[in-house]
């Protein structure tokens, strides 16, 4: 596995804060995990703590380009486990689980909403918007820290287009559609090509065919040699044989 390479654009994405964040114990875990992930070249997406079958701490992370491999999850787990043991943000035994966001991923940053504009999303508000906490619709334009949503669950007398403040959102998750799956596959192929290129495994592009120099030279066609067996030449040769003229008269 190659560690994520951080360019100027990636550095900006790594430093971008989350606008949709967790409360309580998950927030304490986030305060510990976030800097570690950023230092490794990853972005924290979400932390979820569940008590089913014991306590599980699930940490979703991704590379700046949105990709995430099994090797990335393993590397994060190895680096983060001892840090969490020392910081001890959870007062009971737990199992650490590192995962990718998945196709129907949570949206937590401004760039997430921009990246998935035109896709369907379900939104749960922490702070009600016009008396309503649940929305579903198509992601529209982003204005600062607010996002337009064209609702598909609108009822009579309700506004179809709403403008939601991201910091008031408790959860926003993409809805699995054929369009989203196709987009995810396209992004996955692009990320795989980039990884192969970084590893030197991507075959070089086919060289452009070189045009023959013969076809590019601006040369004049060669003159055909003058004929040397014309009637004039034969008569001159006969006269020269007789000694009547010089032998080169036929030229």
UniProtKB/Swiss-Prot annotation:
<keyword id="KW-0690">Ribosome biogenesis</keyword>
<protein>
    <recommendedName>
        <fullName>Ribosome maturation factor RimP</fullName>
    </recommendedName>
</protein>
<dbReference type="InterPro" id="IPR036847">
    <property type="entry name" value="RimP_C_sf"/>
</dbReference>
<dbReference type="InterPro" id="IPR035956">
    <property type="entry name" value="RimP_N_sf"/>
</dbReference>
<dbReference type="GO" id="GO:0005829">
    <property type="term" value="C:cytosol"/>
</dbReference>
<dbReference type="InterPro" id="IPR028998">
    <property type="entry name" value="RimP_C"/>
</dbReference>
<dbReference type="InterPro" id="IPR003728">
    <property type="entry name" value="Ribosome_maturation_RimP"/>
</dbReference>
<dbReference type="Pfam" id="PF17384">
    <property type="entry name" value="DUF150_C"/>
</dbReference>
<feature type="region of interest" description="Disordered">
    <location>
        <begin position="198"/>
        <end position="251"/>
    </location>
</feature>
<dbReference type="Pfam" id="PF02576">
    <property type="entry name" value="RimP_N"/>
</dbReference>
<dbReference type="InterPro" id="IPR028989">
    <property type="entry name" value="RimP_N"/>
</dbReference>
<keyword id="KW-0963">Cytoplasm</keyword>
<dbReference type="GO" id="GO:0006412">
    <property type="term" value="P:translation"/>
</dbReference>
<feature type="compositionally biased region" description="Basic residues">
    <location>
        <begin position="217"/>
        <end position="234"/>
    </location>
</feature>
<comment type="function">
    <text>Required for maturation of 30S ribosomal subunits.</text>
</comment>
<comment type="similarity">
    <text>Belongs to the RimP family.</text>
</comment>
<dbReference type="GO" id="GO:0000028">
    <property type="term" value="P:ribosomal small subunit assembly"/>
</dbReference>
<feature type="compositionally biased region" description="Basic and acidic residues">
    <location>
        <begin position="235"/>
        <end position="245"/>
    </location>
</feature>
